[in-house]
């Protein structure tokens, strides 16, 4: 009986530790500030997005008349009922925007693209990507989101309407709980699919499908739970109406948009964290890169004012744990505390890469690529040093020996 309890306790510890690390990542990347910035940008971009949605769906004869239904479906399923009044104003703004001139439409399109740029920068920061897309690649990404997104939503709406009209599907739906169950699963499915697409397409790096699925699942479930909790709060604690009166819908909508962006960013943090954990299988790295991985991990923890657990480093390093930590202790980079934790012991600003390389007992594996994104700059510096070393050592042996003989002669 004790063994299952120990296993359950171990899994609970792993889950709690993972949640703590996820929250720490979110805080380290200024998730709340980023969500605030995206909320501000959304205020200017929501009407252009609705206008683009209408324009794209109206351009295809099969989608005529779907845009209004699709907007109603999206807002009814993804926005709490408290924002219905504000949603009607947004629809009115979108209808008025359709009668703008070409210059006005271009301005709306630029506003929508600015929001995409902000989202891409936030995601690149989460995935530790220093360069954003430029030129044709960025244009293709934004064009795909602004065009394929509405088309896919319209196609999905048509498909769901068609399936709902089939006798066989309606019979199966009645057995499984009827159309109500289908409509309850529809927003979760739509948001999950959209998050998978966003997490894989927006960051300027390769994101594995299963990592995007994990992040999308967390974000979609959290969004549904948040929507229910938000609606309950507004229903049973209506004090906001006393304070804001008829303008109550505006701050509520802002809070909901902020909460939604925070959830989206948390899902992105999970997808990026899973990718980093996969790349952080240090036991398969060369010892030199393992030592650098330890230094990088200690440095990140030092910036957060924290220490690293001994068992975490042992799990990552595997059998080389003692061999890797010993020279780092001798160099003074890693210091072990009394509570089985490690912390950074030296100012890395006063430690050069040359001194670190000389202190390590292993050869630098220059033939290998950088094992992690945070080590790309160090890898590039080592390769540059190796190129200079090769230029010096490519002199013929005969020339060097003859030069030495001339210096030795009286």
Swiss-Prot record:
It is a multi-pass membrane protein. Pfam families: Virul_fac_BrkB. The keyword Transmembrane applies. The chain crosses the membrane at residues 43-63, 99-119, 139-159, 180-200, 212-232, 247-267. Keywords: Cell inner membrane, Cell membrane, Membrane, Transmembrane, Transmembrane helix. It is found in: Cell inner membrane. One of its GO terms (cellular component) is plasma membrane. The keyword 4Fe-4S does not apply. Its main location: membrane. InterPro entries: UPF0761_bac, Virul_fac_BrkB. Belongs to the UPF0761 family. This is UPF0761 membrane protein Csal_1895. The lineage of its organism: Bacteria, Pseudomonadati, Pseudomonadota, Gammaproteobacteria, Oceanospirillales.
